[in-house]
């Protein structure tokens, strides 16, 4: 992702979860770490207006792969998307979610895009 080629860690205020990034060319890994769990998800660069596509565990595999309850999936994915936008974009950005991917796009969120 833009901004850095070295592994980096970013943390929200307080002792909340952290994301760290391992970057290698057109793809890499995002590590989510909290006091309860840690897991890796992959990403790769995309075609505009998308910047990056992040692969996420499907609902049926979520708890086994992340050790986070299914009830917390939406909030966890929103945190990841918001933090990637904050850490890696220099301007506006928004996220689109589906069962297997988070797509991070540059610019303002169009009125026709649904979460």
Regions found by a protein language model. Give the residues of each.
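Short, basic/low-complexity N-terminal boundary segments at the transition from targeting/disordered tails
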Residues: 1-18, 77, 108-109
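A short linear-motif detector with a strong N-terminal bias
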Residues: 8-11, 32, 74-75, 82
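Intrinsically disordered, low-complexity segments enriched in small/polar residues
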Residues: 12-14, 22-26, 53, 89-91, ...
